[in-house]
């Protein structure tokens, strides 16, 4: 019996041991409940994590696209019409003018101007005019000459006096009183606004800008740009013009470009 009592003495739980065991059991139950709760909540947590990742990717893509747009110099409108975008890689051309080549000369003509059969001056070989306003036109005259250079005609002013038919003829020759800045008995005036003597391709040229006015004119006058040179025994003259009112409404660009582009071979 002594040995049995000893065995029971060693294995019977004490009150402290029972309390510790109950504490551990309660702790294990709490941990299991927390783990179970975590398992129940894990689908929502995984979904939130996935949404956050998707939002981050979208935000990064938006920033990338925005940066590319800011770094590009091509506007949406330009790209739509293929201007600045230059979609096909072809060099841009000036569609406002067309190159016209004649016998011994070349000139740029406004694209919206059409050929005209009207012969206004001797030796005229070309004439184009604006469809909406025939006052805006350009003509080329070629006549034989014994001069070797345009300078053989004298100064630009002296040359103009020898081809004054380019300024137009006075239709009325009766007596008039001084009115509107005109001299007595004169119904037409011509004022030289500018002259220059450029050298193009080794040839001397005269460039003369004249403003003509008539007493009954409704355009406020006409701007005449005359370009002339001598080549191979021929006098080449280009005369481009526009009414004064239209001159300042956009015609200046076309008239000046046509006159300055004229050249003889």
From Swiss-Prot:
Entry keywords, A to Z: Chloroplast, Membrane, Photosynthesis, Photosystem II, Plastid, Thylakoid, Transit peptide
UniProt xrefs under InterPro entries: Mog1/PsbP_a/b/a-sand, PsbP_C
A single GO cellular-component term on record: chloroplast thylakoid membrane
Disulfide bonds: none
Polar residues: compositionally biased ranges: 15-26
Function recorded in the entry: May be involved in the regulation of photosystem II.
Keyword match Coiled coil: no
Keyword Membrane among UniProt keywords: yes
Localization annotation: Plastid, Chloroplast thylakoid membrane
Family according to the record: Belongs to the PsbP family.
Domain of life: Eukaryota
Any one of the GO BP annotations: photosynthesis
A matching Pfam family: PsbP
GO molecular function: calcium ion binding
Record Gene3D superfamilies: Mog1/PsbP, alpha/beta/alpha sandwich (3.40.1000.10)
Subcellular location, principal: plastid
Compositionally biased tracts (Basic and acidic residues): 27-38
The protein's name in its UniProt record: Oxygen-evolving enhancer protein 2, chloroplastic
Region (Disordered) residue spans: 11-45
Transit peptide start and end: 1-69
